[in-house]
Amino acid sequence: MKDITFVDLEVTLNTCRVVDIGAVRSDRTPFHENSFDNLLLFLHQVPYIGGHNILKHDLSYLKPQFEKAGCRQPKIIDTLYLSSLLFPEKLHHQLSKDDKLQADKPNNPVNDSLKSLLLFEEEQNAFERLDSMLKMIYYGLLHDTDEFGGFFDYIDYAPDILDDLSGSILKRFDKEICISSPLAELITSYPVELAYGLSLINCWNSSSGIPLWVLHNYPKVGWVMERLRDTPCENNECAYCRGAFNGKEGLKYFFKYDSFRTYEGEDLQQKAVKAAIEGESLLAVFPTGGGKSITFQLPALMSGKRIKGLTVVISPLQSLMKDQVDNLWKNEIMDVVTINGMLDPVERAHAIQRVEEGSVSILYISPESLRSKTIERLLVGRKVVRFVIDEAHCFSAWGQDFRVDYLYIGDFIRLLQEQKGGKQAIPVSCFTATAKQNVIQDIKDYFFEKLNIRFKTFCSGSTRKNLKYKVFKVENEDEKYGLLRSIIEDHDCPAIVYVSRTRTAAKVATRLQQDGNPDENIQSE
């Protein structure tokens, strides 16, 4: 190992004053003293200094000291940038603080320096394990950058620059990125972001998403990923786009179905899926039991596979959320969770962790959850690709009484877009089984007013062929009750009686019991 010394400075948050200094040489010789003069003596003629986030933290304090002493500044190696590149499956990249028994105990800069040194050794081994083409691609992108130049110099890695870096990337990531990606632009303008994006794609089958540190410091990484994997081209020779944006292939891959459901001969389900895949906002009126869940689940799962995108499904009923999640899990589709009041603290914490780490493509929540700071934090930290509003008729006049919090959805989406920079609108899909024109118009008006969204509409117009309707005219409550008893007695089968109030349900149930119906067969809610 070449001579290298890892340094860590402890600085007060309020006054930005250095209160402790630690360092460790590559031969494990430590330094621990709050003295820059003695630190410079310890660093005398060291060709490299390293640290964890040294570029954005420690170096701003060290550089003036080198200049003041007239010393040449050693080359810099930052293990934080390397960790995010070489261990992309990790969500967090901060140094562990397992030596601290108490949270308020000061950090030990010597221990942190040693941890950085040990991490650097792991990073060298990780780079060695990469295939030769990926090594050359990383070198071609990063050897001239402040973040990575010192690393390549330290390990004496200086291959000939690839003549066609774009072509090499396309060859190395064949069928994993679009062949029409603007690689030349990305190489020139966003080399670090492109390197991080390729690193993520290289481990794409892992459960984690884009590391939070990368998202914070290189927000363009998400945009780069979209250019590579989420912008369909029309080139028939692009194997990636032919598969990644093909709804029928996705249907077969995730749900094992060969074809979409039709409505009276119309391919509305397939058309709605295609619109969602293409990033359009849509309003779908499909009958209950008509396959509307798959219509929004499939594009969500496909987006999760492409760019670790998160689709947020807002549903008014906890039981409905649980049922849909359970059904997906039964089909071995595990990248979906719900966060609601039915979960115990352990289940809730686990669901939150999965959303945060990027292993979830579909999140079911209630409209009330949008007021939760935890939910807001989770969504800010993820690439939210779409909001799906189930039972969207709750926006209409009747829905305001049933679920007032539905009226906050538009405000929340606008707030989330602003927190993410406001440059990209998040598409919305609304699903309902209610085909009344005034209800549909209420939904359209709401989203146009709140988010300037114009929906592409898919209306089945189908009726439930397994349901038959009949209307009876009665003059009073006694006549209504008598007719109800006759219907129940004439049909030896389970029945559901709907009334407008819980109290009325209890009264009807009690009266039926008193009139000779078995107690155990009658329930009211």
Label every model-predicted segment:
Residues 95-180, 184, 189:
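Acidic, Mg2+-coordinating catalytic module of metal-dependent nucleases/exonucleases
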Residues 233, 239-255, 267-271, 277-283, ...:
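Helicase motor core with emphasis on the C-terminal RecA-like subdomain
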Residues 1-19:
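Entry/capping segment at the start of metal-dependent catalytic domains
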Residues 191-245:
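Interdomain "pre-motor" coupling segment immediately N-terminal to P-loop NTPase/helicase cores
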Residues 4, 47-50, 310, 386:
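Structural motif
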Residues 25-96, 100-102, 106-127:
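Conserved DEDDh/DEDDy metal-dependent 3′-5′ exonuclease domain
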Residues 11-13, 55-56, 81, 393, ...:
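Short, glycine/acidic-enriched loop or turn micro-motifs at the edges of active sites
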